[in-house]
């Protein structure tokens, strides 16, 4: 799985999902073209 701050893809077929506890999100303040990254999300 992909660790924190590593590029990811929400498409499961690409097998670039984030590790447990991380979510695949677009960086804040970037355009929609921008790569998704794994971020730690407080529950």
Swiss-Prot record:
Membrane-crossing ranges are: none
Q: Which InterPro entries match?
A: Toxin_22
Tell where it localizes: Secreted
Q: Which UniProt keywords apply?
A: Disulfide bond, Ion channel impairing toxin, Knottin, Secreted, Toxin
Q: Which cysteines are joined by disulfide bonds?
A: 1-19, 8-24, 18-38
Q: Does the keyword Transmembrane helix apply?
A: no
- Which parts of the chain are coiled coil? none
Task: State any GO CC term.
Answer: extracellular region
User: Which terms does the record give in the GO molecular function aspect?
Assistant: sodium channel inhibitor activity; toxin activity
- Pfam name, any one: Toxin_22
Q: In which tissues is it expressed?
A: Expressed by the venom gland.
- Write out the domain note: The presence of a 'disulfide through disulfide knot' structurally defines this protein as a knottin.
Role? Probable ion channel inhibitor.
Provide the family line: Belongs to the neurotoxin 14 (magi-1) family. 02 (HWTX-XVIc) subfamily.
Q: What is this protein called?
A: Hainantoxin F5-22.36
């Amino acid at each position: 799985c992909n660790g924190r701050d590593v590029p990811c893809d929400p498409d499961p077929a690409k097998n670039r999902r984030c590790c447990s506890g991380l979510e695949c999100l677009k960086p804040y303040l970037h355009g929609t073209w921008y790569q998704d990254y794994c971020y730690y999300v407080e529950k």
